[in-house]
């Protein structure tokens, strides 16, 4: 038999758990994007652009374009995910970016402390789950449905 406290906790958990996960995920993405917009990667925007030119050089996407695409994806995607605005588009965009980050870090092994793919994999799985679930009840998207 479920006691009243457990029933109330289940009800609260069912209502608030997903918005909390979505909000915190978005909030934690924002500084990653903002940091890249402000200073690039490791505090050096020119170095970040040069790194992207060297690693991902192709005629379609320059390092400059990729640097800002990555930064805006994390920054604006984080804001959208946090507040549930264009949630699926934002989460899918971050998921795609993280899939490329996983592929880049794959040769370094699993652990992030050795530049492995652990951290981008975690972000990718969480944002993919958000993409699948959508914005949920407590979101800006819900207000426009």
Predicted regions and their residues:
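Perimembrane loop-to-helix junctions flanking transmembrane segments
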Residues: 44-61
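Extended, low-polarity transmembrane helix blocks
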Residues: 1-42, 60-72, 76, 83-145
